[in-house]
Amino acid sequence: MPVRRLLAPDAPAFREIRLEGLRDYPDAFGASMREEAAMPLASFEQNLDRGFVLGGDMPDGQLGGVAGLRFNETDRTRHKAWLWGMYVRPPARGTGLAASLITGIVDEARGKVEEVVLTVGDHNAAAIARYRSMGFEACGVEHRALKVGEIYVNDLMMSFRF
């Protein structure tokens, strides 16, 4: 499934899908729906212009999924980049969009860093299996990484090394 880089004009659609993911899967993201819903649209526009975010459209033209790549900027961590904000809407699941987004992120990082890292809730077996199938390997666990209400979420760290 084709993916494309999202830019400032895509900010309203990006904001919509991002907030949907935060609302429907609060234990899957470090950010909260409340925090990001309070951000002005201009913040989403700036994130798209300054960062690297991919999106894939469904046949109806609506964004079906998104994933971002953030490059570290400090001397000692510049060899790594982070895959963040991965979310595929339920109607787009099983279409190959998740694989296309991950491939696009890895391709963008190739030749620029030594590895792409991500974190995923250790309870999210489907996401972990998808990342493993794409070449990511588990490399650590952060216990109690997130606290959603009164529930703690452990994050599995995974890495794709070039």
Per-range role (PLM):
Residues A109-T119:
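Conserved GNAT acetyl-CoA-binding A-motif
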Residues A13, W82, E115, A126, ...:
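Amphipathic alpha-helical recognition patches that constitute DNA-binding helices
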Residues R76-T77, G85, R89-T103, G121-A129, ...:
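Conserved glycine-rich acetyl-CoA-binding loop
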Residues A8-A11, R15-E16, E20-P91, I102-E108, ...:
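Acetyl-CoA-dependent GNAT
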Residues V117-G121, R132, E137-V153:
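Conserved catalytic-core motifs of GNAT/GCN5-like acyltransferases
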Residues G61-G65, A126, Y152:
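Glycine-rich acetyl-CoA-binding "A-motif" of GNAT/NAT acetyltransferases
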